[in-house]
Curated annotation (Swiss-Prot):
InterPro entries reported in the protein's UniProt record: DEATH-like_dom_sf, Death_dom, MyD88_Death, Myelin_different_resp_MyD88, TIR_dom, Toll_tir_struct_dom_sf
Subunit record text: Homodimer. Also forms heterodimers with TIRAP. Binds to TLR2, TLR4, IRAK1, IRAK2 and IRAK4 via their respective TIR domains. Interacts with IL18R1. Interacts with BMX, IL1RL1, IKBKE and IRF7. Interacts with LRRFIP1 and LRRFIP2; this interaction positively regulates Toll-like receptor (TLR) signaling in response to agonist. Interacts with FLII. LRRFIP1 and LRRFIP2 compete with FLII for MYD88-binding. Interacts with IRF1. Upon IL1B treatment, forms a complex with PELI1, IRAK1, IRAK4 and TRAF6; this complex recruits MAP3K7/TAK1, TAB1 and TAB2 to mediate NF-kappa-B activation.
Entry function: Adapter protein involved in the Toll-like receptor and IL-1 receptor signaling pathway in the innate immune response. Acts via IRAK1, IRAK2, IRF7 and TRAF6, leading to NF-kappa-B activation, cytokine secretion and the inflammatory response. Increases IL-8 transcription. Involved in IL-18-mediated signaling pathway. Activates IRF1 resulting in its rapid migration into the nucleus to mediate an efficient induction of IFN-beta, NOS2/INOS, and IL12A genes.
GO molecular function: ATP-dependent histone chaperone activity; identical protein binding; interleukin-1 receptor binding; molecular adaptor activity; signaling adaptor activity; signaling receptor binding; TIR domain binding; Toll binding
Name of the encoding gene: Myd88
Protein name: Myeloid differentiation primary response protein MyD88
Gene Ontology BP term (one): inflammatory response
Amino acid sequence: MSAGGPRVGSVSVDSYLFSLPLVALNVGVRRRLSLFLNPRTTAAADWTSLAEEMGFEYLEIREFETRPDPTRSLLDAWQGRSGSSVGRLLELLALLDREDILYELKDRIEEDCQKYIRNQQKQESEKPLQVARVESSVPQTKELGGITTLDDPLGQTPELFDAFICYCPSDIEFVQEMIRQLEQTDYRLKLCVSDRDVLPGTCVWSIASELIEKRCRRMVVVVSDDYLQSKECDFQTKFALSLSPGVQQKRLIPIKYKAMKKDFPSILRFITICDYTNPCTKSWFWTRLAKALSLP
């Protein structure tokens, strides 16, 4: 927090902090933020005021009130939303006249951010050149050489992904949340989402087969009532299962994200699912899914 960035009141926030995700802040800083913001007082803005500025609605704030550490829960929930960053957090605290927090924690925040940047740079320097993570990933036919937005048109360096997302158009909002939680956070996974990543003009069945078998290490199936009516999803699921008989390679991961009126598909019942509808395990949902997708 120096003189080099946007100014809010008497506080100047370094511009680079707006590009850092909230995961850059370590446990110590978060605990100190809780000590400042958890107490309810009329003398200064508390965590509820911050939650409103972050865009959370009344019922969401009431849910945070039931948590032992509402500030921690608030930060965990906000860091998965678009627009969240270290810089934006500091900006909101300044707007709420909580400059006392900024002055108290500025050195520790700066230290966390610099450490995060160094770790990211180290990971990038140690990362090998992109190689095929799935055997035989080079397309065998020219028409499958340029099927995704970042593909080499000549087919020499095909775009690779951590997971193919099998979903119905009606479930796109949950898929977008998946993108925010898994790609735009510290997990930094790379998902293949057809509506975003696949170029038009090629047979959908050929594209799906190529991506699932040769470009993606896993496949996530977003199961819903509409999924059960989709011939395309049915093909993708059965094709993925055929590549891993008995699910020995943990290739396919079913997700149930909302209540269903119809029975869960029988071909997926023998696979452990990620259940977003279970309130008791919802807080672990994204961590479990991310770790499953990160397995070698």
